[in-house]
């Protein structure tokens, strides 16, 4: 799930009810949805699970800086993925600045908590497609609530895309 740190809006999501599929395999889909939603993205933040060479390279190829906390036993060997070296070098060069940026990712945990508190635990559905639909609807409902708050508190009028009726 991609989440903006300023307004806590969900910018991209990839939902798979099959728990045998890991989060990292769903990263590209959510990431490219986020890029379409936020073309002026500056950084990409994530848990240590995303600190793999191919993911850091994917992010770097889109001219963005990845901030994924690497494990303690990693090396600078890029093994063909230049984004890996760039991320580790930026951490080595200025650890305080890097960690300051990285810890903005806690906002995504806040959003997960907000959704759970507002909408409760997942329903006990047997059909996998309904589980995915439930998750997507909760995320959309979260964004609608957040946009309502943004309109009121920040006096911002969002531009809703409108389709012509035929």
Residue ranges and their predicted role:
Residues 1-48, 53-61:
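Polybasic low-complexity intrinsically disordered regions
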Residues 36, 75, 146-149:
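A generic secondary-structure boundary signal that marks alpha-helix termini
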Residues 49-117:
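Helix-centered, glycine/charged polyanion-binding patches within enzymatic domains
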Residues 3-4, 68, 142:
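Hydrophobic side chains in beta-strands
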């Amino acid at each position: 799930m991609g989440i903006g740190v300023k307004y806590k809006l969900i910018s991209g999501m990839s939902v798979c009810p099959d728990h045998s599929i890991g989060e990292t395999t769903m990263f590209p889909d959510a990431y490219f949805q986020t890029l379409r939603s936020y073309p002026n993205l500056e950084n990409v933040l994530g848990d240590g699970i995303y600190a793999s060479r191919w993911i850091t390279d994917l992010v770097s190829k889109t001219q963005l800086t990845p901030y994924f906390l690497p494990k303690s036993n990693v090396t600078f060997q890029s093994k063909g993925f230049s984004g890996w070296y760039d991320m580790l070098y930026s951490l080595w060069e200025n650890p305080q600045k890097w960690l300051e940026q990285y810890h903005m990712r806690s906002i995504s945990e806040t959003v997960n908590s907000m959704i759970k508190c507002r909408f409760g635990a997942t329903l006990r559905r047997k059909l996998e497609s309904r589980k995915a639909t439930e998750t997507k609807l909760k995320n959309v409902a979260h964004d609608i609530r957040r946009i309502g708050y943004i309109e009121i508190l920040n006096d911002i009028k969002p531009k809703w895309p409108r389709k012509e009726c035929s």
